[in-house]
Amino acid sequence: MSEPVLQVKGLKTYYYTEEGVVPAVDGLDFEVEPGETFAIVGESGCGKSVTSLSILRLIPSPPGKIIDGEIIYHGQDLVKKSEREMRSIRGNDISMIFQEPMTSLNPVFTVGQQIGESFRFHQQMGKAEMLKKSIEMLRLVGIPEPEHVINDYPNQLSGGMRQRVMIAMALACNPKILIADEPTTALDVTIQAQIMRLLKQLQEKMGTSIILITHDLGIVAQIAKHVMVMYC
């Protein structure tokens, strides 16, 4: 059996508010195998999204703080990493698709500028190469006429197209782990099925491990190898 690509041990993430301490995540343990889909399910408010933000060290502080536990990636504890070290990991080794693409995409930058940012920051590409790779990523996620879409702004795209752009951004640097936080929220049923099928196809092609956060057990039954249930 291969070594887990990610191990979370005894994770505790608390929020310190005026009304007291809120244990958003309180002693969480799980591991993710290479190339698998690991699903996290549970009711709203149980800590699913806080878990994903903790892995990427994106908990807003204050009021939130990881007070205990380990997040082991390739033998290194991400909890002990500096912010500078985490910036080199986010989007490169571990990437994330957020719940709502309209609020996650920047409305004042084109699709090409936003996908290209990952290539510029992590791979130091020039403009011409960035443009070429960005078009390739749009084509990979099934967007028609990527040479034209690359110059569009998010408001010019449908919800399904925006989510495909988010997937292209997340997979741009071929991460080892992709965290998909409710990736089909606010999409109609037909588009939901297309997006999940796309994620599965890309996973098989790129060998990426997926942490799928959802409350849809139908989706989980179709694509997940292991499931973790969280509760309040």
Language-model region placement:
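ABC transporter nucleotide-binding domains
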Residues: 1-232
